[in-house]
Regions:
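Short terminal or interdomain "cap/linker" segment that borders an active site or interface and mediates
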Residues: 160-167
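Iron-sulfur (Fe-S) cluster-binding segments and ferredoxin-like electron-carrier domains
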Residues: 132-158
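Short, hydrophobic/amphipathic alpha-helical patches that form generic packing surfaces
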Residues: 90-98, 132-136, 160
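N-terminal leader/targeting peptides and immediately adjacent processing regions
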Residues: 1-71
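Immediate flanking context of iron-sulfur cluster ligation sites
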Residues: 106-126
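The feature represents the first ordered module of a protein
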Residues: 58-111
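Alpha-helix boundary/N-cap detector
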Residues: 49-52, 83, 87, 125, ...
Length: 167
């Protein structure tokens, strides 16, 4: 499998300082209790309780023949190792904002490729690939713009799945 280099993420080209008006909370807590800071790419333990508990969700997803067939390939793992989880999280934020969050998505149900990026794999594995699946698995209705909190939730789901399957 070959990854297509898209210049969708100019922040990878050069390190920039965090702007004070950032729309994202740059920390997330995985289902394993680890916190990640996307500005620094550092992983550190947290005593703080998790904001989300994905145990029930991942249990339900594991019972789906379609959802449970998705796994990270060796190329996906190498890509994550090369870019780092903080960068992968930024990609997830961007994909959620552009492909899942809008109220009207002209190609809804077909907007997420089945391969080519670890986040795409995670989107299909977690039911965050289109608004129909997002409603079915996460009970967040289509036909309206996702709130900032709902977008952060989707990113947290994706990153928890990636971390679980990467380690």
């Amino acid at each position: 499998m070959k990854y297509v280099e898209l210049n969708l993420f100019p922040e990878e080209e050069e390190e920039t300082q965090k702007s004070s008006d950032s729309k994202w909370n740059n920390k997330y807590t995985s289902d394993k209790g680890k916190e990640y800071n996307s500005d620094k790419g550092n992983e550190y333990s947290s005593d703080e309780s998790n904001k989300y508990d994905f145990t029930n969700l991942f249990e339900r997803l594991s019972k789906s023949a379609f959802r449970s067939r998705f796994h990270l390939s060796q190329k996906d793992r190498e890509y994550i190792a090369e870019k780092g989880l903080a960068t992968i999280r930024k990609h997830a934020e961007d994909f959620v904002t552009k492909r899942l969050a809008p109220a009207i998505i002209p190609n809804d149900g077909k907007q997420t490729p089945m391969r080519g990026h670890p986040v795409f794999i995670a989107q299909h594995a977690t039911g965050c690939c289109c608004r129909g699946c997002f409603f079915k698995w996460h009970h967040i209705p289509a036909g309206r713009q996702l709130t900032r909190e709902e977008q952060q939730y989707a990113v947290a789901v994706l990153m928890a799945w990636i971390e679980k399957h990467y380690s």
